[in-house]
């Protein structure tokens, strides 16, 4: 049984002692203070913790022992693709020639960086079947917003101002309707059929002259491939709408089929999912957006282009109908470096094998867990990269909820799957093992879930009160949402007001 380290660790500010240092700056040759205009000088010293280097190392080492990540063990968050991040990615992203360049440098001095971005775009075009990419968006949701703004600009440019409706399946990621709403669209939900895929009749009834587009994930969030995608594309395009691809689940079809060949007009990808760059904790990520030829003039500026005649890469602002910038400068460059490293190391054959093993792992786990008391598998049996179980029978028969199952999994030293999503599955457990998990790890995960099932029916309180072996047990999610304390300054202010007692 797993037991996580538990330290009564203070905040680093609480370790601070006046005069204690971990780094000494060289003595300035001249009096720097004289050169700084008075209006730019601070009125008070920086409020930084004064600690030694050994104290800093020990502090963060202890905190890391109370954490769990992809290097700790299986991390099967559904639709998150928490795969192993190869360390060569980090080595190249941290290389001085990458780390020490500046986005304001003359483009003649950063030809290597521009080439990295241009080469990455060529890979992404080939993988998706798109004709042009922007690498600017900083995350998947940022990419979604970029995509729907391009859809909006396209229709407005054609004078079709009535197209104010965005169609979104009921199995979609929550950010899809949010991104559409942020762009000013009215969101129309399309129900799923008994197979867990888009209901074509409902789609036919929903499209009209007001339809701007359909946002679709394929495979969808149930891990099921939308096998009627060609018909879906025909329906949307016949109505004058555009088809948008949410690339969250690209890992399930990588190297097998391309969104552009299915009829999609716009795609966003998650480099921090499919292409092994680190994610979680708020970033950094990258959500490049690709489009077909007829939409390229709406992409954010600048793009990275290559002048073959003069053999140089340059920042291209000649994008006549651009929606403008969606992020300052040129995107999260170090993430782009990691993704290109992964692509070059894997190669085309390796990428195809990624999806094959990811699909194999998900279906192996599904087959081994199927039939376990308390869990049921809705919709089709054959899945792509992930599988969604329902713990509704367990809740009904024992009172043990999906949340309890997820918390109990932590006691086995395993990360919980995504829970309560997609919303169309009650008491959902959404499991995506990825291709970097071994058969032994899959077997252990299934055994843990079977053990939890046994406990739910024989000693449910053990599951309901879990976790028992972690550094932190159940947090107050409501308090964290209503009164977030995310900075030292916020904590001090609330402490002074007596609103926190720790």
Curated annotation (Swiss-Prot):
- Cite the InterPro entries for this sequence: GcvPB (IPR023012), GDC-P_C (IPR049316), GDC-P_N (IPR049315), GDC_P (IPR020581), PyrdxlP-dep_Trfase (IPR015424), PyrdxlP-dep_Trfase_major (IPR015421), PyrdxlP-dep_Trfase_small (IPR015422)
What is the E.C. number? Answer: 1.4.4.2
Q: Name one GO molecular function term.
A: glycine binding
Give the record's GO CC terms: cytosol; glycine cleavage complex
Which keywords has UniProt assigned to this entry? Oxidoreductase, Pyridoxal phosphate
Report the top EC class in one word.
oxidoreductase
* Keyword Cell wall biogenesis/degradation on entry: no
Enzymatic reactions:
N(6)-[(R)-lipoyl]-L-lysyl-[glycine-cleavage complex H protein] + glycine + H(+) = N(6)-[(R)-S(8)-aminomethyldihydrolipoyl]-L-lysyl-[glycine-cleavage complex H protein] + CO2
Q: Required co-factor? A: pyridoxal 5'-phosphate
Question: Which biological process terms from the Gene Ontology are attached to this UniProt entry?
Answer: glycine decarboxylation via glycine cleavage system
- Cited Gene3D superfamilies: 6.20.440.10, Aspartate Aminotransferase, domain 1 (3.90.1150.10), Type I PLP-dependent aspartate aminotransferase-like (Major domain) (3.40.640.10)
Read off the SUPFAM superfamilies from this record.
PLP-dependent transferases
Q: Which residues carry this modification: N6-(pyridoxal phosphate)lysine?
A: 273
Alphabetized CDD domains for the sequence: GDC-P
Q: Does this UniProt record's set of keywords contain Nucleotide-binding?
A: no
User: What is the similarity comment for this entry?
Assistant: Belongs to the GcvP family. C-terminal subunit subfamily.
This chain's function reads: The glycine cleavage system catalyzes the degradation of glycine. The P protein binds the alpha-amino group of glycine through its pyridoxal phosphate cofactor; CO(2) is released and the remaining methylamine moiety is then transferred to the lipoamide cofactor of the H protein.
Q: Whom does it interact with, and what assembly results?
A: The glycine cleavage system is composed of four proteins: P, T, L and H. In this organism, the P 'protein' is a heterodimer of two subunits.
Record protein name field? Probable glycine dehydrogenase (decarboxylating) subunit 2
Its taxonomic placement starts with: Archaea, Methanobacteriati, Methanobacteriota, Thermococci, Thermococcales
Gene this chain is encoded by: gcvPB
């Amino acid at each position: 049984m797993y037991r996580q380290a538990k330290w009564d660790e203070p905040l680093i500010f609480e370790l601070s002692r006046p005069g204690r240092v971990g780094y000494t700056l060289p003595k300035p040759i001249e009096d720097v203070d004289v050169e700084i205009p008075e209006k730019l000088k601070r009125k008070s010293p920086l409020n930084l913790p004064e600690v030694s280097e050994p104290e800093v190392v020990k502090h963060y080492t202890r905190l890391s022992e109370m954490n769990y990540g992809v290097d700790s063990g299986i991390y099967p968050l559904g639709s998150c693709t928490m795969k192993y991040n190869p360390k060569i990615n980090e080595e190249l992203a941290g290389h001085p020639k990458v780390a020490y360049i500046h986005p304001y440098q003359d483009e003649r001095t950063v030809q290597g960086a521009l080439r990295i971005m241009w080469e990455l775009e060529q890979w992404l075009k080939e993988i998706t079947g798109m004709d042009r990419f922007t690498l600017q968006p900083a995350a998947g949701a940022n990419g979604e917003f970029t995509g729907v703004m391009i859809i909006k600009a396209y229709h407005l440019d054609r004078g079709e101002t009535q197209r104010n409706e965005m169609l979104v399946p009921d199995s979609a990621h929550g950010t899809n309707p949010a991104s559409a709403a942020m762009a000013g669209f009215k969101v129309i939900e399309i129900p799923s059929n008994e197979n867990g895929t888009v209901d074509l009749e409902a789609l036919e009834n929903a499209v009209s002259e007001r339809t701007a587009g359909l946002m679709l994930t394929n495979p969808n969030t149930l891990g099921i491939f939308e096998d009627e995608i060609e018909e879906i594309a025909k329906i949307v395009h016949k109505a004058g709408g555009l088809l948008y691809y949410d690339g969250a689940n690209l890992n399930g079809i990588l190297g097998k089929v391309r969104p552009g060949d299915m009829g999609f007009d716009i795609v966003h990808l998650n480099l921090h999912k499919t292409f092994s760059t680190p994610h979680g904790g708020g970033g950094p990520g990258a959500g490049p957006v690709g489009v077909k030829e007829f939409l390229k003039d709406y992409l954010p500026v600048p793009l990275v282009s290559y002048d073959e005649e003069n053999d140089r890469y340059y920042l291209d602002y000649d994008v006549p109908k651009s929606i403008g910038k969606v992020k300052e400068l040129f995107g999260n460059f170090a993430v782009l470096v990691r993704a290109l490293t992964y692509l070059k190391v894997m190669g085309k054959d390796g990428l195809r094998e990624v999806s094959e093993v990811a699909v194999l792992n998900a279906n192996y786990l599904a087959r081994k867990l199927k039939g376990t008391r308390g869990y049921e598998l809705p919709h089709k049996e054959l899945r792509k990269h992930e599988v969604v179980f329902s713990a509704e029978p367990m809740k009904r028969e024992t009172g043990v909820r999906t949340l309890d199952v997820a918390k109990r999994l932590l006691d086995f030293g395993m990360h919980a799957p995504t829970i309560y999503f997609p919303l169309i599955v009650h008491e959902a457990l959404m499991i995506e093992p990825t291709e970097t998990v071994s058969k032994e790890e899959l077997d252990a995960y299934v055994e843990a879930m079977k053990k939890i099932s046994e406990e739910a029916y024989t000693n449910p309180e053990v599951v309901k009160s879990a976790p028992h072996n972690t550094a932190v047990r159940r947090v107050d999610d409501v308090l964290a949402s209503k009164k977030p304390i995310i900075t030292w300054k916020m904590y001090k202010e609330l402490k002074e007001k007596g609103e926190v007692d720790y």
